[in-house]
Swiss-Prot record:
Catalyzes the conversion of 4-hydroxy-tetrahydrodipicolinate (HTPA) to tetrahydrodipicolinate. One of its GO terms (cellular component) is cytosol. It comes from Geotalea daltonii (strain DSM 22248 / JCM 15807 / FRC-32). InterPro entries: DapB_C, DapB_N, DapB_N_CS, DHDPR_bac, NAD(P)-bd_dom_sf. NADP(+) binds at residue 35. Pathway: Amino-acid biosynthesis; L-lysine biosynthesis via DAP pathway; (S)-tetrahydrodipicolinate from L-aspartate: step 4/4. Belongs to the DapB family. This is 4-hydroxy-tetrahydrodipicolinate reductase. Its EC number is 1.17.1.8. One of its GO terms (molecular function) is NADP binding. It is found in: Cytoplasm. One of its GO terms (biological process) is lysine biosynthetic process via diaminopimelate. Its main location: cytoplasm.
Length: 267
């Protein structure tokens, strides 16, 4: 039985992950972590998540929570995730990170911290989204430079980072397939007289509003035809189930930084 702890246990995603752990075979909730001073510290994590008493109280002691688990699932912020990754590395515990908004420098730091433990870092834990990553790579290679690429992502009005980590990863996948440097060709802003679109650029548009869980569409636009590859999240449960799947997979793996493509065997 894999002992799984959850960071951000009182949040929306944290609660759905707790439910997913109780529904998964071969996994059990061993700890629930929140920031120091959180008003729900001391509450039963299962009751809060709506799945009944689990006799696991929400704690603000990261060392105790990490010590008692095999793997920590973290959906917080890059700053907190790196702190948790460091704590797991010190105690030789695995970690699954679903936080988004990492800078290139933070990704490098994450890889360095994961040299001694197995860690999964993925902007999206959905099976469907990760299948889209594979499809995008194949489509981009086939179409080559004859099609312009534009990405549009939509999320709820509470999302803090833009564009989404999933949208950025989609752009990176396409850029890699086309032999381009994503950081040089990504275009996040068009306004006024900005000139003609370059052939190499990958456009990125962000929409925020209401309670949209997450929608992503990649447009391959050619002369007289257009291909659209879309994914729409109807519930957060696909993210929570994916994170638990990753948690069960990563325990016992060789040290290093993995992603959901590794978890799903898509590489």
């Amino acid at each position: 039985m894999v002992k799984v702890a959850v960071c951000g246990a009182a949040g929306r995603m944290g609660q759905r992950i707790i439910v997913a752990i109780t529904e998964a075979e071969g996994a059990e909730l061993s700890g629930a972590l929140e920031r120091p001073g959180h008003p729900l510290v001391g509450q039963d994590a299962g009751i809060l998540a709506g799945c009944g008493e689990l006799k696991v109280k929400i704690s603000d002691d990261i060392n105790a929570v990490v010590e008692g688990c095999d793997v920590l699932i973290d959906f917080t912020t890059p700053k907190v995730s790196l702190k948790n990754l460091e704590a797991c590395a010190l105690k030789k515990k695995s970690i699954v990170i679903g936080s988004t908004g990492f800078t290139p420098e933070e990704r490098v730091l994450a890889a360095e911290l994961a040299r001694d433990i197995p860690a999964v870092l993925a902007p999206n834990m959905s099976v469907g989204v990760n299948v889209c990553f594979k499809v995008l790579k194949d489509v981009a290679k086939t179409l080559g430079d004859d099609f312009d690429v534009e990405i549009v992502e939509l999320h709820h009005n509470k999302k803090k980072d833009a564009p989404s980590g999933t949208a950025v990863r989609m752009g990176e996948v396409v850029a890699e397939a086309l032999g381009r440097d994503y950081n040089k060709v990504a275009n996040y802003h068009r306004e006024g007289i900005c000139g003609e679109r370059t052939k190499e650029e990958i456009g990125m548009q962000t929409v925020r509003g209401g309670d949209i869980i997450g929608e992503h569409t990649v447009y391959f636009i050619g002369m007289g035809e257009r291909i659209e590859i879309s994914h729409r999240a109807m519930t957060r449960d696909m993210f929570s189930r994916g994170s638990v799947r990753a948690a069960k997979w990563v325990v016992g793996k060789k040290p290093g930084l993995y992603d959901m493509q590794d978890v799903l065997g898509l590489k």
